[in-house]
């Protein structure tokens, strides 16, 4: 693999032994592909598949009016260009969306009243605007009202049929009651269940249960199907009263086999079938009908082996006594055809009297149901006997009464309701997934029931009941609802599709009513459509759905993890309270699909999961994982993606199974997975092998080195805490990584990657300009301008800042990293810093996971981060007049206004602290009665004296920082102030610079291509002074400007045509650039769309620098978290023998009980990386001085990296590249130790030896305070530490006076409300226990809700008096009011005690 520009500058030594065959899919593919399939933007209208938005429109349209005269058809839809780009939407607080235009066709029919025939009278087609459709950004997010949001994918139970039992919990006997449930994608649920008496019932939508035979009677029988076919052939319809349901005989015939008993002079005999006797205890002797011999005596239990032996011995029929037939069930009606007398009906139990009558009547053959009460139970037959309904009409009316209690049923309405429940595609939809799942469970083929058949069929119902009965008889298995074959993922596209369908259905009703109320001949489609319900449904989904979440933008990893999250919560999913242990637990099918580690701690554990690294979602919504095919014990490079259902059939080996050079398994027995179990299997029996060892964990877990050495609970904390790492001022990639860092940085969109190959023309801190060298389409610009984000605020108030990595003149390839983003370094994710750690106790300052850090960490800004706070103020139009943003604020001194410009807005770069004014604003006061003085002033000066109050935007407590950006928004038509105009001018200058640069590069490339075409051609015309007839040379052209070259005409027609095409393309490109510039300028100058009543809005962004301080939370990657207890002076820290002071001291007792040994291995390996880096740095210095040849440096690098890297990466490098690589390795050699395939203990020892360090990883440390060495050696090394988003500055808070609750008059709680500390019930008990009566009284009255008392106390304190009197607390008055509301009249009287 060729290394990119950035990865060549610093190569990560890889300890992985297993080669990666399949590339890891793009990490945000889940979001992007789903929404692309929903919108189908790039697909031509005629090639769109029936999915997503197209399917929604097709399923709702055509809409017909009630009379049948008008019909509104859907033709096509088109998404136009979005009005604003993503940056503009974020700045203006708008939604990034494209207008949706739908082409509709209105058909008007003429209806012949006599015959009912219809003919088309008129067709009108029109484009109708149907609201805006939010678009996904290139990073897989949505911008809704200016904020970035993510739609989380939802896990839900797949549609289909599921068989289960109650685990013996329902009935006191502990008997298993089996049930089957048909879950459609939308429509009514159908449940089949047994009760304690073994009767089979059916429930529709969890209503009252009905005997299952009622449902079967309601289904069409064979006779009705034949009648329907005959009528259809004649072109006539069938009346519901003519349709006959299934008969008792048909029902019994489907569920039971028939046995035919024949009568001869010796009695009854029947065919001998070994299967029918399996496990049966004989009531009578088993007699061979042919010989009369007793084969097995009565009372014996027949084993399958004995029954099989009898058949092998030639027994074909057995003799049956008449007594044995008593209690059997007739398989069909037994009728005397001569007299018409009925002896037994189908399903009726045979008695001795019946048999005697039949014998008299001369019956020689008797057909009975094969029910032996052992292998086959009489459940359906008993239900049939118990059912009061016997015909289809009775069954339909019974179903109608259950579904619509209280309404009078008729056969027509009952028939329509029943058909609408399960057999009407508009109301019932199994979905393609549901049909595929049902076919697989019931054994149907795709030919019998294709996935377009989305309603239930009679065969489905019958087979479900049959399988349920077989389960009861002990055949088959119940379903595991937590198996990933029974749970599927609904991604953005599908969630959006469902929501849009809801909106369109609301719209449909309105359209239908409007079609009936207007003159259909004169209206256009536009007049019938009101798109508000559809637009409202979309807005509601993105704005308030549980699955539409404010994106976690703390760092690139948290973004990517949020987009890959799978939630079992949300509409149509589970709730926290109802979810049991089984749903939350790790299931064997999670392997390679859902990460078993990354899930939140707390009530959501196991309900919110993360997709595994290599997993992808297939067209049916099931998660697939990749495997390499194994053919006859040889591992191939063919990769197959399989869902959990498909995987169950195969034997799959682990990725770390030992292989030989030629791909054979090295061992005779291999540990493999088969259908959720582990087995030892021979190589030739293996079907597949895992693609990579990291395919079973999520992205965050795959970033933890030595994950295999950490306890699962700590790994969970480690993967969760990496998402909380704050972007630091200087990012540093870890010495000990896993190789996933570059993939996360690339796919998260934090870095900037080149869209196409080219040459870097210009670079500064805000943009990179590249002249493209590939994909040069004639009509397109050959220039790519990448704007870098500078100090932008993220959703979590962290800082987004990008820095260029390339230089002018660099050749870059497609996909190469051009700029680093927040928490990335050289294109790799860099969540924290490598610091020198010692594991030892230090004066109790690392007790209970506390962390002791060196002052160097603070002074060198190692863990300093920048946070950007946003403050916003609006000037509104109030009833009393307009608010004004101004510098002229009443009763405010000049000192407080020093940072404001003449418009009253703070300067960029001003250093501000709590209480400072950011934007001056005044609000009109209501008219108040004037004092004589004011009257005098009014009379003299003729103006109001200060009738405004100060409502300026001030900095809240606890914030100190620098103003980095100001944005001013003006309503259209409102005059812009000087500050707004200055910002606008600056923006326009920046756009003009982009335009001019793009033009210049375009002109250069045009001139070059024109020159190539002109040289060697014969001149036939040109600018003044150019002789015709001569041949064009480079010297000739150098005498003219590039603009004059365009006037040259050449003799060769072909070249002339080519030159004309080139000129045309150039002019079009220049025009496009100018048009784009003018559009953007026009948008800037136009004014903004502000909320109603707002005239002006100002946003001020303040950057706050947060240094590390005691109380901040830090963590490693192994769940080793702690709070900083003390920042120690450097000279007091323990130091190494060479005088190096350690940066951080951790408690060694935090390791054994937590079992996260990975941190110790990381420390040792980091120590070796640092040592090797120092050696390489020393050699580089010698090379630069000319003391040693560069080959010595090459040899050292070859030794460090090993033969594989030396051959692939180092050998092709030139001397300058080797020097640059060595320069970047001075601080430490980065290594990758992939999860489950990382560095072994021997590798760590080897690295330590190469670095010239003690292989134990321990050194003698000395105490910085005394200079004495510590008693024993200490583990020292480099560990990667993160600073988490739990900063003490955000949490510390104090209040003296502040806001109070309206009802109780007690202080509010929480920092956001500037509240107080709650003195709770238990604290009151403590004061009571100590007998501190006065303190207690103070707490319960004047410090809480004694309104008059607290005012008096304040006054007393101001006067210097320290006595006070407590009054009645307000909460007592609330209690009295509460009691009065209960009807208890409580009055307070003065007592004379």
From Swiss-Prot:
Its EC number is 2.7.7.6. Pfam families: RNA_pol_Rpb2_1, RNA_pol_Rpb2_2, RNA_pol_Rpb2_3, RNA_pol_Rpb2_45, RNA_pol_Rpb2_6, RNA_pol_Rpb2_7. One of its GO terms (molecular function) is DNA-directed RNA polymerase activity. The keyword Transcription applies. The keyword Transcription applies. GO terms for biological process: DNA-templated transcription. InterPro entries: DNA-dir_RNA_pol_bsu_ext_1_sf (IPR042107), DNA-dir_RNA_pol_bsu_external_1 (IPR019462), DNA-dir_RNA_pol_su2 (IPR015712), DNA-dir_RNAP_su2_dom (IPR007120), DNA-dir_RNAP_su2_hyb_sf (IPR037033), RNA_pol_bsu_bac (IPR010243), RNA_pol_bsu_CS (IPR007121), RNA_pol_bsu_protrusion (IPR007644). It catalyses: RNA(n) + a ribonucleoside 5'-triphosphate = RNA(n+1) + diphosphate. GO terms for cellular component: DNA-directed RNA polymerase complex. PROSITE patterns: RNA_POL_BETA (PS01166). Keywords: DNA-directed RNA polymerase, Nucleotidyltransferase, Transcription, Transferase. CDD domains: RNA_pol_B_RPB2. The RNAP catalytic core consists of 2 alpha, 1 beta, 1 beta' and 1 omega subunit. When a sigma factor is associated with the core the holoenzyme is formed, which can initiate transcription. Belongs to the RNA polymerase beta chain family. DNA-dependent RNA polymerase catalyzes the transcription of DNA into RNA using the four ribonucleoside triphosphates as substrates. This is DNA-directed RNA polymerase subunit beta.
């Amino acid at each position: 693999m060729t290394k990119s520009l950035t990865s060549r500058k610093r190569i990560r030594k890889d300890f992985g032994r297993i080669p990666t065959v399949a590339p890891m899919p793009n990490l945000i593919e889940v979001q992007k592909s789903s929404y692309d399939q929903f919108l189908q933007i790039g697909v031509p209208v005629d090639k769109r598949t029936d999915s997503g938005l197209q399917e929604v429109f097709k399923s709702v349209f055509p809409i017909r009016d009630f009379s049948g005269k008008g019909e509104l058809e859907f033709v096509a839809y088109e998404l136009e260009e979005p009005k604003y780009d993503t940056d503009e939407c974020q700045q203006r607080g708008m939604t990034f969306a494209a207008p949706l235009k739908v082409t509709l066709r209105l058909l008007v029919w003429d209806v012949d009243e006599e015959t009912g025939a219809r003919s088309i009278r008129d067709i009108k087609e029109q484009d109708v605007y149907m609201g805006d459709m939010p678009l996904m950004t290139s990073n897989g997010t949505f911008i809704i009202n200016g904020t970035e949001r993510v739609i989380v994918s939802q896990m839900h139970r797949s549609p289909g049929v599921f068989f289960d039992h109650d685990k013996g919990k329902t009935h006191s006997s502990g008997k298993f009651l089996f049930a089957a449930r048909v879950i459609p994608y939308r429509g009514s649920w159908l449940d089949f269940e047994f009760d304690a008496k073994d009767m089979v019932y059916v429930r529709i939508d969890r209503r009252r249960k009905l005997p299952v035979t009622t449902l079967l009677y309601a289904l069409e029988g064979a006779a009705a199907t034949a009648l329907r076919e005959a009528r259809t052939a004649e072109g006539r319809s069938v009346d519901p009263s003519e349709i006959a349901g299934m008969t008792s005989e048909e029902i019994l015939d489907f569920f039971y086999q028939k046995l035919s008993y024949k009568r001869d002079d010796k009695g009854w005999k029947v065919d001998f079938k070994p299967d029918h006797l399996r496990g049966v205890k004989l009531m009578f002797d088993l007699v061979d009908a042919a010989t009369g011999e007793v084969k097995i005596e009565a009372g014996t239990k027949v084993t399958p082996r004995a029954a099989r032996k009898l058949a092998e011995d030639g027994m074909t029929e057995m003799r049956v006594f008449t007594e044995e037939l008593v209690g059997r069930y007739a398989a069909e009606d037994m009728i005397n055809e001569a007299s018409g007398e009925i002896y037994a009906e189908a399903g009726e139990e045979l008695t001795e009297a019946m048999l005697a009558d039949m014998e008299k009547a001369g019956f020689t053959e008797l057909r009975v149901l094969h029910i032996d009460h052992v292998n086959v139970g009489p459940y359906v037959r008993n239900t049939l006997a118990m059912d009061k309904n016997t015909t289809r009409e009775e069954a339909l009316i019974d179903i109608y009464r259950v579904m619509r209690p209280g309404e009078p049923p008729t056969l027509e309405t009952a028939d329509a309701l029943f058909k609408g429940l399960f057999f009407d595609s508009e109301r019932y939809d199994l979905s393609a997934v549901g049909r595929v799942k049902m076919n697989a469970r019931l054994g149907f083929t795709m030919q019998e029931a294709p996935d377009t058949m989305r309603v239930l069929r009679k065969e489905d119902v019958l087979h479900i009941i049959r399988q349920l009965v077989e389960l009861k008889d002990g055949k088959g298995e119940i379903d595991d609802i937590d198996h990933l074959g029974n749970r599927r993922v609904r991604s953005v596209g599908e969630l959006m599709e469902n929501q849009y369908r809801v909106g369109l259905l609301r719209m449909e009703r309105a359209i239908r009513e409007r079609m009936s109320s207007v003159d259909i001949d004169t209206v256009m489609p536009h007049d019938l459509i009101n798109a508000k319900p559809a637009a409202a449904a979309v807005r509601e989904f993105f704005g308030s759905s549980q699955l539409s979440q404010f994106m976690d933008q703390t760092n690139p990893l948290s973004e990517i993890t949020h987009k890959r999250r799978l939630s079992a919560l949300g509409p149509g999913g589970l709730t926290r309270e109802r979810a049991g242990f089984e749903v939350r637990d790790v299931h064997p099918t999670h392997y390679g699909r859902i990460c078993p580690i990354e899930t939140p701690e707390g009530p959501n554990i196991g309900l919110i999961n993360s997709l595994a690294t290599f997993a992808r979602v297939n067209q049916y919504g099931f998660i697939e994982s990749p495997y390499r095919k194994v053919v006859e014990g040889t591992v191939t490079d063919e990769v197959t993606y399989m869902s959990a259902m498909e995987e169950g059939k195969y034997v799959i080996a682990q990725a770390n199974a030992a292989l030989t050079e030629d791909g054979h398994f090295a061992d005779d027995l291999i540990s493999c997975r088969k259908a959720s179990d582990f087995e030892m299997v021979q190589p030739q029996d293996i079907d597949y092998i895992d693609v990579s060892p990291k395919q079973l964990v999520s992205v965050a877990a795959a970033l933890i080195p030595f994950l295999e050495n950490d306890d699962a609970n700590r790994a969970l904390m480690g993967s969760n805490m990496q998402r909380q790492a704050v972007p630091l001022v200087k990012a540093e990639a870890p010495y000990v990584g896993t190789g996933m860092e570059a993939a996360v940085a690339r796919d998260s969109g934090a870095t900037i990657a080149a869209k196409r190959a080219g040459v870097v023309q210009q670079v500064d801190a805000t943009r990179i300009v590249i002249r493209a060298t590939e994909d040069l389409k004639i009509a397109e610009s050959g220039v790519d301008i990448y704007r870098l984000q500078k100090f932008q605020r993220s959703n979590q108030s962290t800082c987004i800042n990008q820095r260029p990595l390339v230089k002018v003149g660099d050749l870059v390839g497609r996909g190469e990293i051009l700029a680093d983003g927040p928490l990335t370094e050289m294109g790799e994710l860099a969540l924290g810093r490598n610091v020198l750690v010692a594991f030892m106790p230090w004066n109790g300052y690392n007790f209970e996971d506390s962390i002791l850090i060196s002052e160097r960490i603070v002074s060198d800004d190692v863990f300093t981060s920048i946070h950007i706070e946003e403050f916003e103020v609006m000037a509104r139009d109030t009833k009393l007049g307009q608010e004004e943003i101004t510098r002229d604020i009443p009763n405010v001194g000049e000192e407080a206004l020093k940072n404001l410009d003449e418009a009253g807005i703070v300067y960029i770069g001003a250093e501000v602290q709590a209480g400072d004014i950011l934007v001056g604003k005044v609000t009109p006061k209501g008219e108040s009665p004037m004092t004589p003085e004011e009257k005098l002033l009014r009379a003299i000066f003729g103006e109001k004296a200060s009738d405004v109050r100060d409502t300026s935007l001030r900095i809240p407590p606890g914030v100190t920082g620098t103003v980095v950006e100001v944005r001013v928004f003006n309503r259209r038509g409102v005059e812009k102030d000087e500050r707004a105009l200055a910002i606008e001018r600056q923006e326009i200058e920046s756009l003009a610079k982009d335009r001019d640069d793009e033009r210049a590069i375009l002109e250069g490339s045009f001139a070059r291509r024109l020159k190539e075409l002109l040289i060697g051609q014969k001149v036939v015309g040109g600018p003044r002074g150019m002789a015709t007839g001569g041949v064009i040379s480079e010297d000739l052209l150098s005498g003219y400007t590039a603009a004059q070259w365009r006037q040259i005409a050449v003799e060769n027609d072909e070249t002339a045509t080519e030159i004309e095409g080139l000129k045309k393309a150039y002019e079009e490109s220049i025009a496009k650039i100018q048009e784009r510039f003018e559009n953007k300028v026009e948008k800037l100058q136009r004014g903004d769309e502000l909320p109603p009543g707002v005239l002006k809005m100002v946003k001020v962004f303040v950057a706050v620098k947060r240094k590390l301080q005691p109380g901040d939370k830090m963590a490693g990657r192994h769940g080793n978290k702690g709070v900083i207890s003390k920042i120690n002076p450097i000279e007091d820290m323990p130091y190494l023998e060479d005088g190096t002071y350690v940066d951080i001291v951790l408690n060694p007792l935090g390791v054994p009980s937590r079992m996260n040994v990975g941190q110790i291995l990381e420390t040792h390996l980091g120590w070796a990386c640092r040592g090797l880096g120092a050696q390489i740095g020393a050699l580089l210095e010698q090379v630069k001085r000319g003391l040693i040849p560069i080959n010595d440096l090459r040899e050292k690098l070859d030794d460090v990296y090993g033969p594989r890297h030396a051959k692939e990466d180092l050998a092709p490098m030139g001397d300058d590249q080797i020097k640059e690589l060595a320069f970047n390795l001075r601080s430490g050699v980065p290594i990758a130790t992939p999860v489950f395939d990382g560095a072994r203990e021997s590798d760590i020892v080897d690295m330590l030896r190469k670095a010239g360090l003690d292989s134990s990883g321990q050194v003698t440390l000395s105490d910085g305070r005394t200079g004495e060495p510590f008693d024993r050696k200490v583990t020292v090394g480099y560990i990667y530490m993160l600073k988490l988003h739990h900063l003490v500055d955000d949490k510390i808070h104090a209040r003296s006076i502040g806001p109070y609750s309206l009802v109780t008059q007690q202080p509010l709680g929480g920092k956001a409300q500037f509240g107080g500390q709650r003195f709770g019930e238990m604290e009151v008990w403590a004061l009571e226990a100590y007998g501190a009566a006065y303190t207690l009284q103070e707490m319960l009255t004047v410090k809480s809700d004694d309104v008059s008392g607290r005012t008096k106390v304040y006054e007393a304190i101001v006067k210097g008096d320290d006595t006070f009197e407590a009054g009645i607390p307000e909460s007592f008055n609330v209690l009295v009011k509460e009691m009065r509301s209960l009807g208890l009249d409580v009055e307070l009287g003065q007592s004379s005690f």
